[in-house]
Amino acid sequence: MAESMKGMHRTHRCTELSAANVGEKVTVMGWVQKSRNKGGIIFVDLRDRSGILQIIFEGKDIDEAGFAKAEKLRSEYVIAVTGIVESRGGQVNENLATGAIEIRANDIRVLSESETPPFPIEENSKTKEELRLKYRYLDLRRPDIQKNLIMRSKVATLIRQFLSDEGFLEIETPILNKSTPEGARDYLVPSRVHPGEFYALPQSPQLFKQLLMVSGYDRYFQIAKCFRDEDLRADRQPEFTQVDMELSFVDVDDVIEVNERLLKKMFKETIGVEVSLPIQRMTYKEAMDRFGSDKPDTRFGMELTDVTEVVKVCGFGVFTGAIENGGSVRGINAKGCGQMPRKKIDALVNFAKDFGAKGLAYIQLQDDGNVKSSFAKFMTEDEMKALIDAMGGEKGDLLLFAADKNKVVFDVLGNLRLELAKQLDIIPKDKFNFLWVTEFPLFEWSEEENRYTAMHHPFTMPMEEDLDKLDTDPGSVRAKAYDIILNGNEIGGGSVRIHQDDIQEKMFEKLGFTKEEAYSQFGFLMTAFKYGVPPHAGLAYGFDRLVMLMAGVDSIREVIAFPKVKDASCLMCNAPSPVAKNQLEELGIELTEEAEEELSEGGAEESAE
């Protein structure tokens, strides 16, 4: 039966005690990690969020009732213990931060009993993630998860302090917003008082932070909840946290400079990693040409080589055909892989096909000097030699080629480069490589919609030297946009914003909006722009992803207290869930027959379980 802690006051967390406290009377509280009865002496490992501390219960120190309670302790019981801190002498436990001491108990209260947990509460659990997430409140007790969330809290506190010291104001923006196009799918919230109308949950505070600059607030930041109704993967969630900032009277270099100092401080003070400044910069074009990606992992080489000029006149129709159709031929050199078995090469070909390749051409430069190739019979000896030389090929190398439209070639080789690096285990795990990628295209062409779409968003400023191309060649216009990359992950991105209403109107026009449509969606912003707008720019970090990389884990679910799974559901509280019919009627919502059937089938399955 649970006891009250009335009259007891916790004096320390477990790992706040050390040899300096020997002889003191203390009170600690927490969960029983494990209990061992050694015939008259009971050893209990007590756990709280700080760590573990050993407690000793012995008849000579505690009354009979207290010892009887200690005998009944089980894992995850919540207890309060008062006792004397003692040195463990020569029996130090090097595995514990408190391994040099223990507490000899003279009072105990059982504050709460526990059933046997569905999995052990221990570090590096092998328990299936589905079970862990169903009982997330137990999973959150595990030391490695607690470590991640404590780090998350420290990083958030550091960011707040740094930006406040830099003159930023923390200002909250609305959660219930107007739905606007040009982004991912919105989460919609029906309005009861405006039947048939909907709010949208924010995908970012973009418009409001720009309005704050119009309002004269100069430097704004917010650690904001954002929402996107999209398919999930390891580093995505339907609700996510963004470190959002905006600055007035600045250009690209100003935003980069303050964020470099923020990153340096953040990594040094939380995980002890030195970030060298200035961080390397690379244009979008260079990143794509060298790495096939706008978020390149620069911890290893294996860069792409453009061999279009070398093979534009050759006997291999796949190469020449791609070039004639406006594409290119590029390759990567997998050093030391010349002896790779055919089965593994075939697997790489299939991998390339997943990213749009029709195939993958290869040359094996074997250790004995033999050359094996999927296309050598179509090439002359001189053509093959020129191609191998262009790739820097040597004995023992495997050369892999893609020939297609540039978009496909980059996608295929960029992903193949990463896959090979993982297979060869050549990516240094303890290295943190930062990179700014700049000068993105302002637009990208959507074959599906047969129009230009904004690569970032419709409020991104074109580079001044490209403004005259907006009418004549929009596809070649570069944006004053920048992403910050860490080890092949985009951890943040931003841009200089358009602050002239004529350029903003031109941007909407190029995106296929009529003037009426633009004002219908963004009229409040465009009206605000008529009242004096400072030049402004900003940046936002994906906070969950940033902490994931700092913590060295593979999924952002490991750094979020209560995450969703891939179908955007919560396994712990079963959200989303059906709601009462009267709630829907109040909102003027009626379910389709198909939805009704799915709900009734789901209910039948649940009752069967």
Regions found by a protein language model. Give the residues of each.
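Class II aminoacyl-tRNA synthetase catalytic cores and aaRS-like
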Residues: 1-609
